[in-house]
Curated annotation (Swiss-Prot):
GO terms for biological process: NAD biosynthetic process. It comes from Thermoplasma acidophilum (strain ATCC 25905 / DSM 1728 / JCM 9062 / NBRC 15155 / AMRC-C165). It comes from the Archaea. Pathway: Cofactor biosynthesis; NAD(+) biosynthesis; NAD(+) from nicotinamide D-ribonucleotide: step 1/1. InterPro entries: Cyt_trans-like, NMN_Atrans_arc, Rossmann-like_a/b/a_fold. The keyword Transmembrane helix does not apply. This is Nicotinamide-nucleotide adenylyltransferase. Its EC number is 2.7.7.1. CDD domains: NMNAT_Archaea (cd02166). The keyword Chloroplast does not apply. Belongs to the archaeal NMN adenylyltransferase family. The lineage of its organism: Archaea, Methanobacteriati, Thermoplasmatota, Thermoplasmata, Thermoplasmatales. PANTHER family: BIFUNCTIONAL NMN ADENYLYLTRANSFERASE_NUDIX HYDROLASE (PTHR21342:SF0), PHOSPHOPANTETHEINE ADENYLYLTRANSFERASE (PTHR21342). Pfam families: CTP_transf_like. It catalyses: beta-nicotinamide D-ribonucleotide + ATP + H(+) = diphosphate + NAD(+).
Length: 179
């Protein structure tokens, strides 16, 4: 009997933070594939308003969430940016296990993988009005409720690392401090 080749998908995002929309996308991808590689993009950035969390913190957010969901068929790979788009796919390939299909809604990522002959699929965004990293970070800074927008393990990690205090402090200017 011939064995079936495992079908492995690739998804990349900054996950600043990992939210319920990301979780739904992971579940949808896994409904069509045997496993998923989740690339933690812009892994070298942290401690800014746009990228407040480290790659390690994002790794914790994702792995704890997937464990709670009883999802075990995944790989988490931090991927630093390469400031040469023509080299980026090779960079990703060097860091990850082989994959068959790429899921992205990012036009540049789509183009780069298509040029390398990958099958690229998009997924519908889930509750995009509320579940975006930008919107969630804005809520954190403003002191608005954000906890319902992310899975419970993400809330726990953010509290463990004092993430709310961090992002609020990062959102201030030196003029705010001297007043």
């Amino acid at each position: 009997m011939e064995s079936r080749k495992e079908k492995r998908a690739f998804l990349i995002g900054r996950f600043q933070p990992f939210h319920k929309g990301h979780l739904e996308i992971v579940k949808r991808i896994l409904s069509e594939n045997d496993s998923i590689i989740i690339g933690i993009g812009s892994a070298q950035y942290s401690h800014t308003v746009v990228n407040p969390f480290t790659a390690g913190e994002r790794h914790l957010m994702i792995s704890r969430t997937l464990e709670k969901e009883r999802i075990y068929n995944y790989y988490l790979v931090p991927i630093e940016d390469v400031n040469a788009n023509s080299l980026w796919v090779s960079h990703v390939e060097a860091l990850t296990p082989k994959f068959d299909i790429v899921y992205t809604n990012n036009p540049l990522v789509r183009r780069l993988f298509m040029e390398r002959k990958y099958e690229v699929r998009s997924l519908p965004m889930v509750n995009r009005k509320e579940w975006t990293g930008t919107k969630i970070r804005e809520k954190m800074i403003a002191g608005e409720p954000w906890e319902n927008d992310v899975p419970d393990p993400v809330v726990e990690v953010i509290h463990e690392i004092d993430g709310i205090s961090r992002i609020r402090q990062l959102s201030t200017t030196d003029e705010d401090i001297t007043q």
